[in-house]
């Protein structure tokens, strides 16, 4: 079969994995553990993908600790059915839950990955049947980047938006100390120690060596991959899939630092993320971005490469989901030279003394919902408008304690943020409304009504602060409600929020073996898709902390486990365009 991209060098392997995030590395590690030859091709200059800049949680119900604490499969299924009832995928959920214990056992027993099992990490919709306060979401243990030796600088750095002077706080007690750094001597000392260690390491090693959150997970997975003999290629985009005369995918053509024609005997596993960075696909699938200029993604490498390669190979995009993306409202800092820096508001709008309003000065939802659910409210509320946006509003007390996005709390200076238009200030609500183009009467009425309930620890309009998950997104030391405080002390502040994401839930259509399927539903031999590249097993719902990573680890593991079996099971027991090797056949028979 003729291909459009020519490379002189041919390199053979059993499995080619495209992408080095959680899904790709899970597939690579499991495949390598079976004696298979694996290449991981990452188009970015660093390994780790979006997972490496994330909080690193993994939503994996049915894990040993949660099960021992009383969580049941029936409860999980009930919760997921209620989360996205019209798009519930019973078979996919069954595969996910069947595999969770096996996958976690593999990572903890056969790789360097270690997990922490927090007692409390509420599901995102605690008001739904089957939701639980904990036992389903886990996170990786911190690690030292020096375990990678001279390869430690090949890992994706932290996203600056998520760090405080280079340190990335963890959800829970750690981040709460940072919230109270200017209110408590204990918190100040705690934060000072963390920052001094971070700065010392950065000066000595060029980067902080303590890795936490998703960066710790990816550091441990990449270390394990090197130890297992996986060939790790950075800055090596896959330019094109190659196919045999029978239509089976036989490998790919790569460019960048490793230009080659890669012959993958058993298959290609697409784990290159979603398509939120692809303007044309956003215009087609994102409900708020028909013009392609009204969405701001902080993801790494989610340019739709896997989706476009799949479409070229005869596959399709499955958008039969309740939400095509995992929404995450952001504030956008714009530099004079046109560059942008995004701050994803994954927690902060749920803090007491902050509200979000529309162009009419009206609130449009419970700001302490998950970023995904609040983002969905924001998109729906702006339907029919030319742009999707809102404003985060705070008074002086709240700004002093918590700040907004990049504009940090006292004693950090704010002048630069005023100058660049990121933060707007008004001595009164009317003055602030005038400066941001919001209806002044609407804003003053909204704040007055909100304040009445907030003083009593209630939100009659939207029920903010009414669930344990809401409280988890607030300030647990604030009374009477961790999510509510009146806005009653000028001056007042505003920052514009727009729509971002953490990945896509619509994605490549796959069958029960993660094989990519055509419009007719026929599997394409030798081509698998996992992680954010594939349609979400949760049907567009966002069940809890780490929903992307949990599914990525589990289905990446399944793809790596099954790729040899799938190749061996083809007609006449052949691999992709050639007989499977003896070792492959033996492994598939085990």
From Swiss-Prot:
The GO terms describing molecular function are:
steroid dehydrogenase activity, acting on the CH-CH group of donors
- Record-listed E.C. numbers: 1.17.3.-
Record field: catalytic activity:
4-oxocyclohex-2-ene-1-carboxylate + NAD(+) = 4-oxocyclohexa-2,5-diene-1-carboxylate + NADH + H(+)
Against Gene3D superfamilies, the record matches this protein to: FAD/NAD(P)-binding domain, Succinate dehydrogenase/fumarate reductase flavoprotein, catalytic domain
The prosthetic group or cofactor this protein requires is: FAD
Q: Which UniProt keywords apply?
A: FAD, Flavoprotein, Oxidoreductase
> InterPro entries in the record, alphabetically?
FAD-dep_OxRdtase_2_FAD-bd (IPR003953), FAD-oxidoreductase_2 (IPR050315), FAD/NAD-bd_sf (IPR036188), Succ_DH/fumarate_Rdtase_cat_sf (IPR027477)
Query: A biological process (GO) annotation for this entry?
Result: steroid metabolic process
Protein's UniProt keywords contain Protease: no
Which top class of enzyme applies to this chain? oxidoreductase
- What PANTHER family does the annotation carry? 3-OXOSTEROID 1-DEHYDROGENASE, FUMARATE REDUCTASE
Which family, according to UniProt?
Belongs to the FAD-dependent oxidoreductase 2 family.
Please state what the protein is called. 4-oxocyclohex-2-ene-1-carboxylate 5-dehydrogenase
